């Protein structure tokens, strides 16, 4: 009986002397590599403020989009102002009337159509320009817009130059050809057509900026790919 009790005591003492097993801590996660760190760092920065070629191309694409929206105003205003420039002048009675109509001059007709076409093109090019903001590496879209913008520069410049010549004759006349100025009688007609010509030349300047931006974006993309 005593031996059994002694064995039991020895067994309890051995169990009390043991320490509980501690859990082994998991190994630390591997440190992220440099590209991963850069990606995480760029993820918290707005895409327009990111450094590097991609952020620069996005800024240029956004500027291109804003310029297209800005160019729609002058072209549309020039087309509407020319189309509504007709004026009637009554002399003595309503039976003797003189009219100044824009479609009496082929230059004004061409001018109105060219500005309307340019405004429609700018409206249709907005989705392509917005796609360039989302995908700044899409060189094919930039090249297509560059070609179309160049065509619009030529078209609007030719139309504005032709209309400017007619407006000058309407204001100053031509003594050698015995053409008298008509703006002294048709104030509204000359005012509308003159404003339309100024707006059209403003649109030409914006188109030139668009061509310059498109060429710079394509050239920078080509240089980055080459290196």
Curated annotation (Swiss-Prot):
<dbReference type="Pfam" id="PF04535">
    <property type="entry name" value="CASP_dom"/>
</dbReference>
<feature type="transmembrane region" description="Helical">
    <location>
        <begin position="60"/>
        <end position="80"/>
    </location>
</feature>
<feature type="topological domain" description="Cytoplasmic">
    <location>
        <begin position="129"/>
        <end position="149"/>
    </location>
</feature>
<dbReference type="InterPro" id="IPR006459">
    <property type="entry name" value="CASP/CASPL"/>
</dbReference>
<dbReference type="GO" id="GO:0005886">
    <property type="term" value="C:plasma membrane"/>
</dbReference>
<dbReference type="InterPro" id="IPR006702">
    <property type="entry name" value="CASP_dom"/>
</dbReference>
<feature type="topological domain" description="Extracellular">
    <location>
        <begin position="81"/>
        <end position="107"/>
    </location>
</feature>
<comment type="function">
    <text>Regulates membrane-cell wall junctions and localized cell wall deposition. Required for establishment of the Casparian strip membrane domain (CSD) and the subsequent formation of Casparian strips, a cell wall modification of the root endodermis that determines an apoplastic barrier between the intraorganismal apoplasm and the extraorganismal apoplasm and prevents lateral diffusion.</text>
</comment>
<keyword id="KW-0812">Transmembrane</keyword>
<feature type="transmembrane region" description="Helical">
    <location>
        <begin position="108"/>
        <end position="128"/>
    </location>
</feature>
<feature type="topological domain" description="Cytoplasmic">
    <location>
        <begin position="1"/>
        <end position="59"/>
    </location>
</feature>
<dbReference type="GO" id="GO:0048226">
    <property type="term" value="C:Casparian strip"/>
</dbReference>
<feature type="topological domain" description="Cytoplasmic">
    <location>
        <begin position="219"/>
        <end position="227"/>
    </location>
</feature>
<feature type="compositionally biased region" description="Pro residues">
    <location>
        <begin position="23"/>
        <end position="33"/>
    </location>
</feature>
<keyword id="KW-1133">Transmembrane helix</keyword>
<dbReference type="GO" id="GO:0042545">
    <property type="term" value="P:cell wall modification"/>
</dbReference>
<comment type="similarity">
    <text>Belongs to the Casparian strip membrane proteins (CASP) family.</text>
</comment>
<dbReference type="InterPro" id="IPR044173">
    <property type="entry name" value="CASPL"/>
</dbReference>
<feature type="transmembrane region" description="Helical">
    <location>
        <begin position="198"/>
        <end position="218"/>
    </location>
</feature>
<comment type="subunit">
    <text>Homodimer and heterodimers.</text>
</comment>
<feature type="topological domain" description="Extracellular">
    <location>
        <begin position="171"/>
        <end position="197"/>
    </location>
</feature>
<dbReference type="GO" id="GO:0007043">
    <property type="term" value="P:cell-cell junction assembly"/>
</dbReference>
<keyword id="KW-0961">Cell wall biogenesis/degradation</keyword>
<feature type="transmembrane region" description="Helical">
    <location>
        <begin position="150"/>
        <end position="170"/>
    </location>
</feature>
<keyword id="KW-0472">Membrane</keyword>
<protein>
    <recommendedName>
        <fullName>Casparian strip membrane protein 2</fullName>
    </recommendedName>
</protein>
<feature type="region of interest" description="Disordered">
    <location>
        <begin position="17"/>
        <end position="37"/>
    </location>
</feature>
<keyword id="KW-1003">Cell membrane</keyword>
């Amino acid at each position: 009986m005593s031996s059994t009790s002694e064995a039991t005591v020895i067994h309890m003492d051995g169990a009390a002397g043991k320490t509980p097993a501690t859990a082994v801590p998991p190994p630390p996660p591997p440190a992220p590599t440099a590209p991963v760190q850069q990606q995480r760092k760029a993820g918290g920065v707005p895409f327009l403020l990111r450094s590097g070629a991609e952020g620069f191309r996005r800024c240029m694409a956004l500027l291109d989009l804003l310029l297209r929206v800005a160019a729609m105003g002058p072209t549309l205003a020039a087309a509407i102002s020319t189309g509504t420039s007709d004026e009637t002048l009554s002399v003595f009675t309503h039976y003797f009337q003189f009219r100044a109509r824009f479609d009496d001059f082929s230059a004004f007709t061409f001018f109105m159509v060219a500005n309307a076409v340019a405004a429609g093109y700018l409206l249709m090019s907005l989705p392509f320009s917005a796609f360039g903001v989302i995908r700044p590496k899409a060189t094919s879209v930039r090249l297509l817009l560059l070609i179309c913008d160049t065509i619009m520069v030529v078209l609007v410049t030719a139309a504005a130059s032709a209309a400017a010549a007619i407006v000058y004759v309407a204001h100053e006349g031509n003594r050698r050809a015995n053409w008298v100025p008509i703006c002294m009688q048709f104030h509204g007609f000359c005012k509308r057509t003159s404003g339309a010509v100024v707006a059209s030349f403003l649109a030409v300047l914006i188109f030139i900026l668009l061509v310059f931006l498109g060429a710079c974006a394509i050239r920078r993309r080509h240089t980055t790919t080459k290196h």
